[in-house]
């Protein structure tokens, strides 16, 4: 039996949303086998340091981050399970950058790339636009009145409103135009002109529809009439020209390690435990004052939550112009009395420095145990999650152990927050759970049983696991790449917060006792699964591994 290394009854997390008393920089002591807040803090401060440059997949920061993980698993004595006897599995990513000399015309009028249209390409080779008509299909908010798929076939389909499901509704579209309010185009334009990271695949050269985001003011250039005068089925201009991209290889790497099991037969089966090692890199628009940005986003989120009782899609979004102006006055006052702390690095302390540290803590606990679990433990730190789950997609398509030998996968992504001021309903016992019963009732029951065995158990929040939930969290982290092959999974997360995908996601704002409590739960679940006398029973339908994820 493994030694109990963390008594959950003695873990009393502070509210992670409160003003942090932790330092900007911290150097901890060498880590020990016990899963402790001090060890987790030491790891996150290293992994989410500015020197890691935001850990973007396919960039030097990603190399630095994975090198740190590799040093740790080597020190722990784990077995390499990557390529050619190493801990690394190469993932063939590449970047695709818009060629701003691309030329496109609507009838005889020249269109200005980025200004009139901001193309976002999802992969493959853009379908040719030469000689194609634009058709306005309507708004996805009222699908009953939209143009039919037959009307749209072979044309560039223009829509307004939300875009979810547009590609499924119009499979014969040669391209898509999405109209957006002029005021929202800034971020889209920056994204369109930056390099997009993608995964090499067999259909790299397959023609796929290009999506162009167009400001409402430019709608007449494509439709021939203002957007407010367009009706579903309106056929507009004819496009001429092409949109071109420059492609550059940007290889990245997963880190893969094994703790061999103790049973001579069951050690050939694996319980996978994972997190993602990448984040967003550097802010393309340049440095911002970190403290005033955080102050703005905190106030903005409080206003949005009070109005809607849910988190905004991104911190600072969902406000009226009047609300933004009011907050800016307060933030300008703060900036006037405090020195600027300029920053352009997306440190990703919670996303997913917390998960990476948690998995390392779990690995060190089992590596230091006198009695090992019966089944082997497979630790995978995936790359490319932020760009599209690429590392986990590559690993599950090219596993370094038999895919059928993986009995379950436990995914940890963002486990360092969850306070009352972070998320509605948050607190010391808060934890989101997704997917635990989507393939295996037994796995879901086992997670619940382990949790209930603690003196101070978590209160699991299952709301984001609901079928059809608009956030689609089940489809948005690495666990799904395992689930698509019928491997039972559970996704553990403390959820979103004001620093999500901001340069303010820094180590000093994490709740390390809460992180440790989650990591201990995951370790105990992994141990239970690894010591079962049978494989976790799959009693639910398996998805199509090549199909689209639908929650």
Each model region followed by its residue ranges:
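His/Asp/Glu-rich mid-to-C-terminal helical/loop segments that flank catalytic regions of hydrolases
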Residues: 493-551
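Noncatalytic luminal/extracellular "stalk/propeptide" segments of secretory-pathway proteins
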Residues: 53-156, 161, 242-247, 251-254, ...
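Short, solvent-exposed loop/turn and secondary-structure capping segments
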Residues: 58, 102, 147-149, 169-170, ...
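N-terminal hydrophobic or amphipathic helices/low-complexity stretches enriched
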Residues: 17-80, 285, 316-331, 539, ...
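Metal-dependent peptidase/peptidase-like ectodomains
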Residues: 113, 200, 209-212, 217-221, ...
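Second-shell loop/turn segments in exported
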Residues: 26-34, 50-60, 90-92, 136-137, ...
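Acidic/histidine-rich catalytic neighborhood of metal-dependent amide-processing enzymes
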Residues: 251-254, 281-284, 294, 299-442
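Long, well-ordered, tryptophan-enriched scaffold segments
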Residues: 180, 199-254
């Amino acid at each position: 039996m493994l030694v109990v290394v963390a008594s959950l009854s003695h873990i009393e997390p502070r509210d992670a949303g409160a003003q942090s008393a932790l330092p900007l920089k911290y150097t901890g002591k060498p880590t020990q086998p016990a899963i402790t807040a001090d060890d987790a803090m030491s790891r996150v401060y290293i992994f989410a340091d500015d020197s890691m440059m935001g850990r973007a997949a396919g960039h030097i920061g990603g190399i630095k981050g994975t090198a740190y993980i590799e040093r740790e698993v080597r020190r722990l004595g784990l077995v390499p399970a990557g390529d050619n006897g190493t801990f690394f599995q190469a993932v063939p990513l590449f970047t695709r950058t818009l060629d701003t000399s691309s030329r496109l015309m609507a009838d005889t009028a020249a269109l200005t790339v980025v200004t009139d249209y901001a193309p976002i390409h999802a992969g493959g080779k853009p379908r040719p636009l030469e000689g194609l008509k634009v058709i306005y299909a309507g708004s996805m908010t009222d699908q009953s009145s939209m143009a039919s798929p037959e009307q749209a076939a072979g044309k560039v389909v223009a829509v307004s409103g939300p875009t979810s499901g547009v590609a499924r509704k119009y499979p014969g579209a040669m391209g898509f135009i999405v109209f957006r309010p002029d005021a929202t185009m800034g971020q889209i334009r920056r994204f369109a002109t930056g390099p997009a990271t993608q995964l090499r695949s067999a259909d790299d050269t397959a023609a796929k529809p290009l999506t162009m985001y167009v400001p409402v003011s430019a709608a007449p250039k494509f439709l021939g009439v203002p957007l407010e005068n367009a009706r579903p089925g309106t056929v507009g201009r004819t496009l001429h020209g092409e949109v071109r991209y420059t492609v550059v290889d940007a290889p990245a790497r997963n880190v893969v390690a094994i703790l061999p099991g103790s049973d001579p037969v069951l050690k050939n089966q694996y319980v996978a435990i994972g997190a993602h090692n990448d984040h967003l890199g550097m802010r393309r628009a340049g440095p911002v004052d970190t403290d005033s940005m955080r102050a703005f986003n905190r106030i903005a989120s409080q206003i949005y939550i009070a109005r809607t009782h849910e988190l905004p899609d991104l911190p600072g979004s969902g406000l009226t112009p009047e609300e933004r102006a009011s907050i800016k006055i307060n933030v300008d006052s703060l900036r006037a009395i405090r020195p600027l702390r300029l920053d352009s690095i997306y440190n990703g302390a919670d996303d997913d420095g917390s998960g990476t540290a948690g998995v390392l803590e779990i690995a060190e606990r089992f590596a230091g145990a006198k009695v090992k679990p019966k089944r082997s433990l497979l630790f995978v730190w995936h790359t490319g999650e932020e760009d599209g789950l690429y590392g986990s997609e590559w690993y599950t398509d090219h596993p370094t152990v038999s895919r059928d030998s993986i009995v379950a996968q436990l995914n940890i992504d963002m486990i360092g927050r969850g306070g009352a001021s972070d998320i509605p309903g948050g607190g010391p016992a808060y934890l989101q759970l997704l997917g635990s019963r989507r393939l295996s009732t037994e796995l879901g029951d086992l997670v619940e049983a382990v949790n209930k065995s603690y003196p101070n158990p978590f209160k699991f929040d299952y709301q984001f696991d609901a079928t059809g939930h608009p956030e689609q969290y089940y489809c948005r982290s690495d666990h799904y790449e395992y689930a698509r092959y019928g491997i039972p999974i559970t996704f553990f997360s403390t959820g979103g917060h004001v620093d999500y995908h901001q340069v303010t996601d820094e180590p000093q704002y994490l709740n390390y006792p809460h992180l440790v409590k989650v990591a201990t739960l995951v370790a105990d679940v992994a141990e239970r699964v690894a010591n079962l006398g049978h494989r976790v029973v799959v009693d639910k339908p398996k998805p199509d591994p090549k199909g689209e994820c639908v929650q």
